[in-house]
């Protein structure tokens, strides 16, 4: 996808979309701030926000960090949204703790702030969170991997390809969920890397992209060339891991699992590159977020969480062509009908 950089001042991608008439534009405006503008997940998120903004007559401006982990650009984007008089902000935060003071500044200025995909830390630092149940997403692929391996899971050698050093909540939740599903004690539920299960070879970071996934996989293979299970933060990282394994002739005897459910990722499940993936729905997250900002602007009402949860759950499905007993899943044909990117 061709990128157009419109705001070099804070190293973020910014795009104002005038979907409202001049009289309406002054009434309701919103900001979408994502981690990057290149990951298909966030591209689809922006599409969902833009379509819903057009439908509701909301003026939308979109911003993104230069890379996953670029929190400085997100901080600058929040400042811009406050100065522009936006009614609300949808944010997929790169640094879920470091961004909190700036989020609070926006809330103090009267903006509704909704975390998309990645909960802030603490969760109530945002007015609401619209997200996949990332713990469940991880648990589903962990259960599937354990059942697929059977008794061999007890002697597995597991590599974790994580997101960034700051350990954002989405990273922690997916890791912890996988461990629970696979039968590994995650120890501190809010921390990555404190586990003592001998099956874990190690963790490395990917920045959520293919190049990072390849490098992280190469690093962990040097640590232990007998790795046979790989948990990846997302499908671009999984694709990179596969390339690293292929380069040493290991691609057919290592089980890779992931989270995202984008069309390229679902295709990779169908082709055997990825064993299974948990599919999430970014377009819905963003569309619901724009609806919430419009409602807040019109009535002052804030979103309420899904019953029994502390966030608005936008759904998750396990995609696998080799189903296992006790773990509900959909096949890749159905996954392709629901995918994005």
UniProtKB/Swiss-Prot annotation:
InterPro entries cross-referenced by the UniProt entry: Peripla_BP_I, SBP_2_dom
Chief location: periplasm
Keywords, sorted A to Z: Periplasm, Signal, Sugar transport, Transport
Triggers of expression: Induced by fructose.
Signal peptide feature range: 1-20
Gene Ontology MF: a single term: carbohydrate binding
GO cellular component: periplasmic space
SUPFAM superfamilies on file: Periplasmic binding protein-like I (SSF53822)
Domain of life the protein comes from: Bacteria
Keyword tRNA processing appears in the UniProt entry: no
Subcellular compartments: Periplasm
Pfam families found in the cross-reference section: Peripla_BP_4
Subunit text: The complex is composed of two ATP-binding proteins (FrcA), two transmembrane proteins (FrcC) and a solute-binding protein (FrcB).
Function as written in the Swiss-Prot or TrEMBL entry: Part of the high-affinity ABC transporter complex FrcBCA involved in fructose uptake. Is also a high-affinity transporter for ribose and mannose. Binds fructose, ribose and mannose.
Family: Belongs to the bacterial solute-binding protein 2 family.
Protein name: Fructose import binding protein FrcB
Organism: Rhizobium meliloti (Ensifer meliloti)
